Amino acid sequence: MSFKEEYQKKLKTADEAVKVVKSGDWLEYGWCVTTPAALDKALAKRMPELENINIRGGIVMWPLEITKIDSPADHFTWNSWHMGGLERKWIKEGFSYYAPIRYSELPGYYRNYIDHVDVAMMQVAPMDEHGFFNFGPSASHLAAMLEKADCVIVEVNENMPRCLGGFEEGVHISKVDMIVEGENPAIAELGGGGAATDVDKAVAKLIVDQIPNGACLQLGIGGMPNAVGSMIAESDLKDLGVHTEMYVDAFVDIAKAGKITGARKNIDRYRQTYAFAAGTKKLYDYLNDNPECMSAPVNYTNDIARVSSIDNFISINNAVDVDLYGQISAESSGIKQISGAGGQLDFVMGAYLSNGGKSFVCLSSTFTDKAGQMHSRILPTLHNGSIVTDTRANAHYIVTEYGMANMKGLSAWQRAEALINIAHPDFRDQLIKDAEKAQIWRRSNK
């Protein structure tokens, strides 16, 4: 049987395909831009007759139809590997929960600890001449997840970019049970957190001054990493490489400015390596069939040993809060879950262990609440219930618009002094009093 004949044999409508779902099932809903669309719509019609359904996914970028039914919590539970704004909203509605992970371990979770998946469904690129459906810009953990699925349903989207890789960037038709030709929606776009602010630019300048020619970059999402990317694109830096968890628009700008060659990378030379991507159409168009860009599973991109083997590795990520001990929360504010651990700790550790490498965790020194009250992001201790994403033992450079502090080798009082020095001036006196109370302040300190 040819691949085209097998394709026709497995072709179903979305309504036909979701009939396989039954109460009590564990479902997989892809990841990020591969979250199903037509299948989600079809399942929403059936969901009121189902109960005790568990669904795994993450970084949902548009409102899902299954969440629009009456009383979703009576029918299913959403289990998120990494939360976005919609999933935070669903927490309040009682059917969404975060699953704490080090993102790099996710393929191993499926292969070693998750017994099985009843039904996996996701959007993919059209089948190629060799019978493969490409995962688009989301290799991530999808190959490992499909290995555990009793039933694999792919939803073909003709707009899905075909993202080349080295391995585990797609699934062969022989491993697929049903094929649905979807409605071909445009690939969901993710903004970079708005235009860079003056604070973002100040932080970016401090970091860019620390980046040498030939460095290998990892950028997170948000205004500060975007500001760093814009500044790099306009700089005199050259021969930069990319080895990152998330590929964002800033990398496209840097590449088109001629700054990225990958010529000095110790591994995957001349290629930009990433686990998943989300951004604007500009990004998806750049990644499509681009042999310079290498889509790879997250246990490859985020492996600490692999990251540390790359010389001059520069990791740039965001934080929510930092306390005077150097503990970093990048995923919650108190008990309120904001995002997830992701791969930040892996890159913080890998960059530090790299020859010439540096990890930068960035944050604005303050934020203003809805009532107009300004608060310090550098705290005496993290808020009660806040999750420690990066421990004080792992923290490297912490950066605000007032400067950067290298935590390595510093005792408790030295850390307190260094962090107070980069806090907003309006909060420094109170932070000194808090440090004294915690017995991490010396009288000889300024």
Swiss-Prot record:
Superkingdom classification of source: Bacteria
Reactions this protein catalyses: butanoate + acetyl-CoA = butanoyl-CoA + acetate; propanoate + acetyl-CoA = propanoyl-CoA + acetate
One Pfam family named in its UniProt record: AcetylCoA_hyd_C
Annotated keywords: Fatty acid metabolism, Lipid metabolism, Transferase
Gene3D superfamilies on file: 4-hydroxybutyrate coenzyme like domains, Acetyl-CoA hydrolase/transferase C-terminal domain, Glutaconate Coenzyme A-transferase
EC number, UniProt record: 2.8.3.-
GO biological process, alphabetically ordered: acetate metabolic process; acetyl-CoA metabolic process; butyrate biosynthetic process
Active-site residues from the entry: E245
InterPro entries named among the record's database cross-references: AcetylCoA_hyd_C, AcetylCoA_hyd_C_sf, ActCoA_hydro, ActCoA_hydro_N, Butryl-CoA_acetate_CoA_Tfrase, NagB/RpiA_transferase-like
Purpose: Coenzyme A-transferase that converts butyryl-CoA to butyrate. Can also use proprionyl-CoA as substrate in vitro.
Protein name: Butyryl-CoA:acetate CoA-transferase
Record organism: Anaerostipes caccae (strain DSM 14662 / CCUG 47493 / JCM 13470 / NCIMB 13811 / L1-92)
